């Protein structure tokens, strides 16, 4: 199994994704939100690029819609929820459709439409994601959503942890240089939150008093489901 990493949503080459399995990672916080919402019984998540698109879907849909998302880590005016996974509890999302728009994560998802299979991962479900990848048994591209088109330490080290989870299942992994680097960084910094504390996006969230979000997002493997993006929306994968 060949594994490569793309460092941000802006670095996605759509042609490279054809017939590939893709994993989208945005641990702070979009993929943590999506994984949490699906785990708590959300019917589906619709990732969109713009605020206007999200509002149009809510206006025209006959489904029970929750609008969620952020711009520059802040809740969008008129939306029900921000991009905090702690808000997407079973009480509020069970049986409902979440329309989500974020600065980085939903852009990475939508830019990956050419891929054969698209799975959503974060630290909170990495082991479950690794098991799904093993079952698929196909070459893999891990897409880090990044921060405003730039490299993000938090997504990168999460990729390294996901690779480590895969190594615990199988040894026939062929890593690109960047994938080797991510794995090396994780194996030498297994206390991920301590390593990431000086990262730009971490500091931004901390400055907004979102420490509880950070604590939640840096937990490993507290959720056993893997969301899958297909045909414009995200549901619980059956892989």
Swiss-Prot record:
Query: Taxonomically, which superkingdom?
Result: Bacteria
Gene3D superfamilies from the UniProt entry: ComB-like
Offer one Pfam family short name for this entry: 2-ph_phosp
Listed InterPro entries = ComB-like, ComB-like_sf
- Reactions the enzyme catalyzes: (2R)-O-phospho-3-sulfolactate + H2O = (2R)-3-sulfolactate + phosphate
Q: Which SUPFAM superfamilies match?
A: ComB-like
List the molecular function annotations (GO) for this entry. 2-phosphosulfolactate phosphatase activity; magnesium ion binding; sulfopyruvate decarboxylase activity
This protein's UniProt keywords: Hydrolase, Magnesium
- Which cofactor is essential here? Mg(2+)
In short, the EC number is 3.1.3.71
Family membership noted in the UniProt record: Belongs to the ComB family.
Protein name, entry field: Probable 2-phosphosulfolactate phosphatase
- What is the originating organism of this protein? Clostridium botulinum (strain Loch Maree / Type A3)
Top-down, what is the taxonomic lineage of the species of origin? Bacteria, Bacillati, Bacillota, Clostridia, Eubacteriales
């Amino acid at each position: 199994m060949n594994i490569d990493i793309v460092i941000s949503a802006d670095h996605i080459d759509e042609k490279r994704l054809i017939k590939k399995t893709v994993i989208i990672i945005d641990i702070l916080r979009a993929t943590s939100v999506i994984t949490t919402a699906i785990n708590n019984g959300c019917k589906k998540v619709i990732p969109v690029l713009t605020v206007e698109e999200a509002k149009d879907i809510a206006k025209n849909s006959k489904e029970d819609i929750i609008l969620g998302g952020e711009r520059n880590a802040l809740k969008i005016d008129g939306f029900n929820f921000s991009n905090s996974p702690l808000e997407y509890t079973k009480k509020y999302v069970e049986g409902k459709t979440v329309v989500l728009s974020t600065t980085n994560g939903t852009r990475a998802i939508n830019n990956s439409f050419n891929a054969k299979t698209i799975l959503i991962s974060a630290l909170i479900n990495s082991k479950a994601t690794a098991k799904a990848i093993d079952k698929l048994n196909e070459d893999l591209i891990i897409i880090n959503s990044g921060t405003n088109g730039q490299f993000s330490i938090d997504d990168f080290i999460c990729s390294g942890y996901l690779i480590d989870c895969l190594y615990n299942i199988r040894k026939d992994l062929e890593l690109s240089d960047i994938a080797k680097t991510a794995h090396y960084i994780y194996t030498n910094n297994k206390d991920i939150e301590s390593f990431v504390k000086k990262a730009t996006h971490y500091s931004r969230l901390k400055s907004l008093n979102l420490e509880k979000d950070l604590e939640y997002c840096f937990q490993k493997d507290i959720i056993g489901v893997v969301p899958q993006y297909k045909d414009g929306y995200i549901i619980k994968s059956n892989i």
